[in-house]
Structures are given as structure tokens and as C-alpha cells.
Amino acid sequence: MVCSPVTLRIAPPDRRFSRSAIPEQIISSTLSSPSSNAPDPCAKETVLSALKEKKKKRTVEEEDQIFLDGQENKRSCLVDGLTDASSAFKVPRPGPDTLQFTVDVFHFANDSRNMIYITCHLKVTLAEQDPDELNKACSFSKPSNSWFPVEGLADICQCCNKGDCGTPSHSRRQPRVVSQWSTSASL
């Protein structure tokens, strides 16, 4: 089994694009210039293609929501480390604006695609915010059979065992969300 490090660099969103822009829209808007070869936006093929893409996007969003509903009480716990996978956050963090983790490479049976998509939902808080049960990054260590945080006190990961990380029991102050955005990348 091959593990590959994935680095998430937390950077401010690019204001030139809307939150709903998909990578193809971003690439085409930054790389292309108006040309006479552009498809007619009113052509039947263009409209059908756009509807097909919209349906595909909605299906992916619905699947993501189904997954997230099941993971809601395991916030910030990298739960696949409990199985035979060796996914884990890297400790220490490479920098204050970087969170790094590894994931096992896998392939679905009967799926010939050569690309996978990884969706990460990040909550950004102030650097001065002390890690707590709601604002943490925890991995499972099989040798010690316990959860450990990237930073902060070890007990902030105890909720990962219970599967209930929804309410901070010893938060020093309420987290303040600085900003939220989403982005996509190919590996």
C-alpha cells in the first residue's frame, strides 16, 4: 500500500471568482480569451451539456451531504485510521498556516477512472484560539490504541472515542470563524 502526503495550505480566497466556481470555470476564465470559436450559449448542445453538468454536480453534492451527515459527530477526527488504513495528520505542523496529512491510495473495484476527488471541509479559526473539542485535528495511533492531537492537550481527542465532538466541554473561549471557502485540487 502506498501513502502519499497531502498538504492543505490555508490561504485567503481569490475574490475574482464566486464560491460556486468549479475548476473548469476557473481555468477557462483565466486561460481563455474571447474567440470566435466559442460555442453558442443558446445552442441545443450547449444547453444540454450545461444541464448534464448541473445534474452531475448536484449528485456529487448530495453524496457529500449523505457522508457528512454520518460524520457530523466525529468532527476533526481522522476516523479511517481506526481501520487498516494508515491515514494520519503530520505532527508537528510545517507552519501555522499549514495542516498536512497522509491518506492511503485506493481504487474502487470496476472503476476505470484514473482520478479521485478529495473533499475537505475546513473551519478556520484565529491562531490564538486554543485547540478544543470543536477546533482540533486528531489522528488514531494503533500502537498506543489512542487518539492524539496535532497540537493542544491530549484530552481534546477523547470525544473521538465517544463519537460525540459536538459540544466543547472545556473550551476556553468561543471559536471565531475568520472565513470559509472551498477549493479543489487534483493529485
Curated annotation (Swiss-Prot):
Taxonomic superkingdom:
Eukaryota
Composition bias type Polar residues, residue spans: 177-187
Q: Which stretches does the entry tag as region Disordered? A: 166-187
- Tissue spec: Expressed in spleen, thymus, pancreas, testis, ovary, small intestine, colon and lymphocytes.
Q: What Pfam family is a match, any one?
A: Zona_pellucida
Gene Ontology CC: nuclear membrane; nucleoplasm
In its UniProt entry, what is this protein called? POM121 and ZP3 fusion protein
What is the species of this protein? Homo sapiens
